[in-house]
Amino acid sequence: QGGDWGSAVTCAIGGNHANHCAGIHVNMIVGQPDPATMSDLTDAEKAYLARFGWYRAKDNGYSTQQATRPQTIGYALADSPVGQMCWIVEKFHGWTDCGHEPGGQSIGGHPEKALSKEAMLDTVSLYWLTNSAASSARLYWHSFATFGFGEIHVPTGCSLFPNELMRLSRRWAEGRYKNIVYW
């Protein structure tokens, strides 16, 4: 199943190793809007574009930081367990279904509405005790230059959940995923 980085790995397997892959399933559907549809957008597509615009302008700083200066954030996070916790829990607040409107406007949300305190502390501890914040940030730096949007022909399942960061309409997804068997 591919969500977040799992989506990138899943799509790489489905696109580059189709002879050894029976199919893929992603819930972060990565692709590009079809320019030919821009004059005939559905209401959902307009909402998807607005959400992506909001994400790029207001919620993408972590990604830019890690993709361009991974060591800086890596040293900062390796220096403070509280800093490490804040960095991660802030993402849980923004990216879990814990009381947000799509687009990030908080309506009293708290991550514990979606995850237990223990689950969040387990995640923070995994990064802190292994001192892996910098290497995790470098994944962005190493990977962004090699991302592709090549076609995928293996059978593909796509799940769209209400507050996913990335959303495509089916017609846009079909530009990349050529054999969608579940939507």
Regions found by a protein language model. Name each.
Residues N16-N19, N27, N60, N131, ...:
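Detector for Asparagine
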Residues M28-I29, A50-Y55, G104-Q105:
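Short, surface-exposed, polar/charged, turn-prone segments marking secondary-structure boundaries
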Residues Q66-W183:
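C-terminal subdomain of alpha/beta-hydrolase-fold enzymes, centered on the catalytic histidine
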Residues Q1-L49:
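Conserved hydrolase catalytic core segment
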Residues D4, D34, D40-D43, D59, ...:
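Acidic-enriched, low-complexity/disordered segments with a strong bias for Aspartate over Glutamate
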Residues S39-P70, G150-E151:
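The feature captures the conserved acid-bearing segment of alpha/beta-hydrolase catalytic domains
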